[in-house]
Amino acid sequence: MEHLLAGLNRAQHEAVTATEGYVRVIAGAGSGKTRALSHRFAYLVNELGILPGNILCVTFTNKSANEMRQRIHALTGDNDTGYINTFHGFCVSVLQEDSHAVQYPKSFLVLDNSDIDAMLGIIYGERGLTLRDMTYSAARDMIEIRKLFKEPEYYKDMITVSLDTLREKYERADTAGDIIFYGYLYQEKKCFGLDYNDLIKFSLYIFEQHEDIRLKWQQRLEYIMIDEFQDIDALQYELMEVLCGYHGNLFIVGDPDQTIYTWRGANVKYLLDFDKVFPNVQTIMMMENYRSTPEILAAANSLIAKNGHRIKKDLLPTKPSGEKVVCHFADTQEAEAQWMVGEMKRLHDRGLPLRDMTVLYRAHYVTRAVEEALMHEKIPYTIYSGVQFFDRMEIKDALSYLRMIAYQDDLSFRRIANAPKRNLGKRRMAFLQETAEKEGTSLYVTLKNHLEDSVFSGTKAKQFVDLIERFSHSYQGRPISEVLSDILDKSGYEKALRTEGSQERLDDLAELKQSIYEYETSCGEESTMEHYLAHIALFSNGDVAEQGDKVKLMTVHAAKGLEFPYVFLCGMNEGIFPSRKVRTLPGMEEERRLAFVALTRAEKGLYLSEADGWNFDGSPRYPSRFLLDIDRELLSFTHEVDETLLREAADDVARRDKYLREDDGDGTLPIGQRVRHAVFGEGTVLDVDLNKGAHVIQFDGMGTPRSISLRAKLEKIGP
């Protein structure tokens, strides 16, 4: 036991050993909560004898889950690390075990955005829609909004209604929104595919309808731990309530000062009111910070103290003193960027690698001047956005080959049947689609059944079928990395990339193989092809890091949960950070929490900067209120402060604050309310955007939702 508890501070020790009942840990930024969680898991296993398979540990990103698995493996020496997942990843486990309860096979597909876009392509082609009717991005958003708000019971159709009935519903649809929505549900059911929204909905349905399955999972999960509890949404909370309903051993960790996802459905009240909902809650405050210098923490504490609705607490430093937080006022954005790059060069000349330096910002458009300055000085950098690793063409193709081997589904077939070229172009694919519809078979089975048809003469269709047949009968029991290398070689895919001279794509494939090898090593016997494909479909931004000595650029939201030796927070101007879109007092407090998150990413050095000039609307640009919030003695200014500028900035903040509303819901309609607009006709309220002061309404005759001012006249239809 000593080695598990050694080195823990009092609060961490208390969190690790408080194993029974309901426990809430308020853990400040950099306070070692990941260490406490991993040691608590190991304590349950090594000291109390709890089986890893009886513990559920929920994190909010796959990267966090992987880090947690590695830490726990190092502590326990056991490859069995139980259920360490995101909520969506855990639901995949539930559905893989109990998919029979919803008439789905264990080999269901977890759909990502590229899969959804492929389905949309089929729907648009069949029904004559174009991107003028609705872009794919808007269609994905519309589908998600309808699933969450307008038709939250949609999943019952996917479970209980026949495929033919769903197709009839799709064929009867006459508006762009209905065509896309019902066409998508039909395509989902046709290939037994589930998107992120479906995973939790289907799991909750199973637990609601099948008491034996619910009880099985409740009894199995003797201990439940949930990280980042301030980010939990209503569906995740409902799932948590179900799972802990038998043993009542629930351990949650969160920080209300880091609630920055309310726009995505997160609700900090679940953390703040935890002791009001559950009995005999033990609350532990974990405030010692092991990340940042006292100077950085003092500035962060000073900033967040200006929020009124919070648990009053301060982060306590444990690291030795460093340099004061630097603050720079520039005349222009170009001058701001040049100053930042000059500071980076100074740090680099001291021997610090560029990868230790990170630029954070509230909005992407702020980076233009920074990028230009970096390029001018020939300083390499990478932006953590754009095409992420698992969305790159060659990676999607490689994973589609694996999915084709395991599932032989239509989405994978469409992607790789002609990659590399096999002379299976649009005409032959159209023939396959039409024939498959008539015969009620998949595209791959249709191709197998019609190989001798004249339409496939002069193609490599038979070689493709032989390849898939050979691998589909031999892949089980083989290492996934070996299967991937083999099929990329036998298919000619890698050879085609070499012929094209696509070294970067070949490097990406090498990285994929290495990541699969690491997955196999960490998962042991659980590393089946099916498990891996479900695991990889859940990956999101930031799960694969860029390599090399480069300056990193990313939004503050993307930096959540990360830490960097030196942070440059730029664009600290009113209207940029905080965003000009903020319309409410709670919205402004969330912006301040976001700034707090940005400051607490820094370990050794923190640089804050703003640029004078003019906003998009022609108004003068002033320093951010967040710079004014920090006590001046905690900052080191690069030049003498212009007191007139600061007074004007304070006056500007006071003017803006007059227009901030209390978030009391006055004048808003409930989500799901049917309404009638004088011009747009009837529609349904999908959301209320208090920051914009608008209802988000999907009108029946329009393809995309509209934001309608709260002041606009709307007639309620029905209750």
Where are these regions (language model features)?
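C-terminal accessory regions
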Residues: 571-704, 710-719
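Conserved helicase motor core of SF1/SF2 NTP-dependent helicases
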Residues: 31, 230-309, 313-318, 437, ...
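Helicase P-loop NTPase motor core
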Residues: 25, 31-37, 279-282, 287-380, ...
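Walker A/P-loop NTP-binding motif
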Residues: 35-50
